[in-house]
């Protein structure tokens, strides 16, 4: 079953290059091929200035070094991809999403990971990180690129930063709209490949489903066999039933009330 999940994160100065190396699995790549164990399915980047067009890490290192201390060096979309799709179909979906959301505006880097989920099946997802300084065709060295924008003389200042000054409510609305655009695109690709699954980015409450959303586990928690078993039990405890009027509802048998409860197998 395709999973509906899209989260948005913001990276501060000093975090961009390490995160780019993490999603690109640089440490695994440095190991001998026969010893490397990586869940990296595909990675790529685009819209980089000339001084980073052959190595995106140069861009993120410059962002960490020259972006103002209280500024953001990147935004990241972490998105679950349909496990029903094969690797080629997933890449096509991601590239279409990047074309529609990023286009030629922002420098970006992405990586598709495909680790094993708790049920032993694939858990494909993409990390898409991008910098919101607009590409305007003006050549700037790394230091100038991240300076404040000069509206009167753009060539003298840094690249203009997009989407600044938005309120919390505006950002919240933007994310809701983004999730809907992703759902529409993802479902169109599922239909294109004649796959039955569809995703719905609405909350359980908005869908009329009586179910509490799961809390996201930390990587260390997800690897803990006791937590994995308890969470699997929790998931199977939800029995989906269809009511007489055709609407979907859920019968809740028990739910984990906290991570401590999950860890110790105690349910409400």
Name each model-derived stretch.
Residues 1-268:
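N-terminal nicking endonuclease/strand-transfer module with a His-rich metal-binding environment
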């Amino acid at each position: 079953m395709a999973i509906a999940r899209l989260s948005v994160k913001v990276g501060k100065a000093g975090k961009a290059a390490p995160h780019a190396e993490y999603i690109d699995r640089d440490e695994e790549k440095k190991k001998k091929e026969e010893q490397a164990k990586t869940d990296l399915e595909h990675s790529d980047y685009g819209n980089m200035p000339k001084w980073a067009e052959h190595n995106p890490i140069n861009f993120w290192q410059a962002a960490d070094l020259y972006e103002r201390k209280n500024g953001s060096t990147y935004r990241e979309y972490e998105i679950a991809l349909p496990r029903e799709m094969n690797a080629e179909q997933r890449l096509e979906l991601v590239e279409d999403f990047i074309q529609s959301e990023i286009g030629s505006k922002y420098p970006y880097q992405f990586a598709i990971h495909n680790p094993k989920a708790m049920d032993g099946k694939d858990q494909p997802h993409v990390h898409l990180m991008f910098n919101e300084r607009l590409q305007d065709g003006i050549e700037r060295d790394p230091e100038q690129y991240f300076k404040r924008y000069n509206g009167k003389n753009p060539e003298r200042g840094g690249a203009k930063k997009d989407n600044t000054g938005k309120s919390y409510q505006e950002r919240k609305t933007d994310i809701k709209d983004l999730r809907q655009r992703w759902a529409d695109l993802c479902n169109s690709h599922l239909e294109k490949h004649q796959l039955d699954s569809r995703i719905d980015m609405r909350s359980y409450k908005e869908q009329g489903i009586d179910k509490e959303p799961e809390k996201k586990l930390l990587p260390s928690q997800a690897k803990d066999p006791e937590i994995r078993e308890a969470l699997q039990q929790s998931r199977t405890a939800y029995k989906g039933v269809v009511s007489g009027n055709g609407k979907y509802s859920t019968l809740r048998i028990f739910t984990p009330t906290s991570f401590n409860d999950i860890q110790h197998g105690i349910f409400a």
